[in-house]
Regions:
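Nucleotide/phosphate-binding catalytic cleft detector across ATP-hydrolyzing
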Residues: 1-140
Length: 140
C-alpha cells in the first residue's frame, strides 16, 4: 500500500484525510482522546501546539510517531484496516530548503525498522515499511 505523508513544520498532510498539526503529547498512561496512539509503552495524542521548528526531523522519534498517526488515518480512510501485517511504501515530503541535505537521512529514518507494532483508537496495527521515497513538500 502506497501512503504519502507531507511532513510540514506546521502540519502533517496526507491524501485522504484532513491535515493535522505537527504536534503531539506523550504520556505514560492512556489519554482521554479517542485518537490515542500507543507505541513502545508510551501513549500519544495529537495537539494543536506544534513541535518547535526542527531543521533535522530525525533527531528524535516525534516525526516518526506523527507518521504513524498519518499512516493509521490513511489506512482507516481507505477502508484498508487489517489485523495482520501491512506492507507500506512510504512517500514523504520535506520542506524544499532542507530537501537536498536531509532527504537521505529522512529515508533512513523510516527504513530498516522491521515490523512496527502500535495501537490506534484501541485497534492493533502492524506495518512494515518496505521502501521510502522522499520528495520536496507538495510533491509526495
Amino acid at each position: 500500500m502506497l501512503i504519502a505523508v507531507d511532513h510540514g513544520n506546521k502540519q502533517i498532510k496526507t491524501v485522504h484525510t484532513p491535515p493535522f498539526t505537527s504536534g503531539l503529547i506523550q504520556s505514560d498512561t492512556p489519554g482521554f482522546g479517542t485518537d490515542a496512539l500507543a507505541y513502545r509503552g508510551k501513549y500519544y495524542t495529537l495537539t494543536d501546539q506544534r513541535i518547535p521548528y526542527r531543521r533535522d526531523k530525525t533527531e528524535d522519534e516525534r516525526f516518526f510517531i506523527l507518521t504513524l498517526f498519518a499512516i493509521a488515518h490513511e489506512i482507516e480512510a481507505m477502508g484498508q484496516y487489517s489485523g495482520s501485517l501491512m506492507r507500506v511504501q512510504l512517500a514523504v515530503g520535506l520542506p524544499p530548503a532542507h530537501f537536498g541535505v536531509q532527504a537521505k537521512r529522512f529515508i533512513n529514518y523510516f527504513n530498516g525498522r522491521g515490523a512496527v507494532a502500535f495501537q490506534f483508537k484501541g485497534k492493533p496495527y502492524a506495518i512494515f515499511i518496505e521502501n521510502t521515497a522522499c520528495f520536496p513538500q507538495s510533491f509526495s
